[in-house]
């Protein structure tokens, strides 16, 4: 078994997420982050013969797994696209406003993190790439080679929430003048040496690597586009289930769901007798945020930071 094929992914909040979708046997569902198919497989078990499931992923290895599943089960189709583009895909299929549930499991999968060739991790040395789809866009090495010091600092600070972002960016620019960054371990060492206050139990390079990965893949921009598209794609009564893994993602999801659950009546004159439909809430929040259980965290430490939020379309 090759190193890549042996890499395993443990699906986070598996039962909870599929239960939150409130699966209808004949419904149409979207798995916006297919990954290695954990959520999709369980969802298919709950669909009847007329149910349909459409999976999205940018990662070519995830697509290969999805195509194998599609060959086994005719109710499932997978496309190599970001979930940010789900609106276009849904429209092409005539599903706009007719999707029963959408699941987004954000972040990077274990196979991506653990495979040195992908360049996501400082723990396993590999090419400094970080792209979810290696055939598209600019690699982390290419971006680090050309970005100015202020831009590097902004990415580390805004997306990695790294308080020593300026100091780290300065170290990166000074070092690249001598030789380009090509390996993850090389960048990690420079970042580690530039961080004067290590957090217990966390590598000094963790936050900067997170910020770089988010920027390279436009993760927050994709999330905002994907949430807007998901709301339009859902039918009334359809569920949106989102699992996030860091505060930046969760803040976007929380604010999106709250904004659409509140509506925009506060923008209208107070004495208006009837609230126009365009200003009424489009979502209602379902339950409280859910977190991985102690047992799940023990079995899969990467689930510790997971937060799941659920909303239902009402208009």
UniProtKB/Swiss-Prot annotation:
Transport recorded as keyword: no
Keywords carried by this UniProt record: Cytoplasm, Methyltransferase, rRNA processing, S-adenosyl-L-methionine, Transferase
Ligand binding (S-adenosyl-L-methionine): 37-39, 57, 83, 105, 112
Subcellular location(s) of the protein: Cytoplasm
Catalytic function, reaction form: cytidine(1402) in 16S rRNA + S-adenosyl-L-methionine = N(4)-methylcytidine(1402) in 16S rRNA + S-adenosyl-L-homocysteine + H(+)
Disulfide bonds: none
Gene: rsmH
Cited PANTHER family: 12S RRNA N4-METHYLCYTIDINE METHYLTRANSFERASE, S-ADENOSYL-METHYLTRANSFERASE MRAW
Described function: Specifically methylates the N4 position of cytidine in position 1402 (C1402) of 16S rRNA.
MF GO annotations: rRNA (cytosine-N4-)-methyltransferase activity
Annotated stretches, region: Disordered: 296-315
Enzyme class name: transferase
One Gene Ontology cellular component annotation held by this UniProt entry: cytoplasm
EC number: 2.1.1.199
One GO BP: rRNA base methylation
Family that this chain belongs to: Belongs to the methyltransferase superfamily. RsmH family.
Main location (coarse class): cytoplasm
The protein's name in its UniProt record: Ribosomal RNA small subunit methyltransferase H
Source organism per UniProt: Stutzerimonas stutzeri (strain A1501) (Pseudomonas stutzeri)
Cross-referenced SUPFAM superfamilies: Putative methyltransferase TM0872, insert domain, S-adenosyl-L-methionine-dependent methyltransferases
């Amino acid at each position: 078994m090759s190193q890549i094929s042996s890499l395993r992914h443990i699906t986070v909040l598996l039962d909870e997420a599929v239960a939150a979708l409130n699966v209808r046997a004949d419904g149409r569902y979207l798995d916006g982050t297919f990954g290695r198919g954990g959520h999709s497989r369980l969802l298919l078990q709950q669909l009847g013969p007329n149910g349909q499931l459409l999976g999205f992923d940018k990662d070519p290895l995830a697509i290969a797994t999805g195509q194998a599943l599609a060959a086994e089960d005719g109710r499932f189709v997978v496309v190599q696209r970001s979930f940010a583009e789900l609106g276009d895909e849904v429209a092409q299929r005539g599903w706009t406003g007719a999707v029963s549930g959408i699941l987004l499991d954000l972040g990077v999968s274990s196979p991506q993190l653990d495979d040195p060739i992908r360049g996501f991790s400082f723990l396993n040395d590999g090419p400094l790439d970080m792209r979810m789809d290696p055939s598209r866009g600019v690699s982390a090495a290419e971006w680090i080679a050309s970005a100015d010091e202020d831009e590097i600092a902004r990415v580390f600070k805004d997306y990695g929430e790294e308080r020593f972002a300026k100091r780290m960016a300065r170290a990166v620019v000074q070092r690249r003048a001598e030789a380009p960054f090509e390996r993850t371990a090389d960048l990690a060492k420079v970042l580690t040496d530039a961080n004067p206050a290590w957090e217990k139990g966390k590598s000094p390079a963790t936050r900067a690597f997170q910020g770089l990965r988010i920027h390279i893949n436009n993760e927050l921009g994709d999330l905002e586009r994907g949430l807007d598209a998901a709301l339009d794609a859902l039918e009334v009564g359809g569920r949106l289930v989102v699992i996030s893994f860091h505060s930046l993602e969760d803040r976007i999801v929380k604010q999106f769901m709250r904004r659409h659950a509140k509506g925009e009546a506060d923008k209208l004159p107070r004495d208006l007798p009837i609230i126009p439909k365009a200003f009424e809430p489009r979502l209602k929040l379902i339950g409280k945020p859910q977190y991985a259980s102690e047992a799940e965290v023990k079995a899969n430490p990467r689930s510790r930071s997971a937060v799941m939020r659920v909303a239902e379309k009402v208009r």
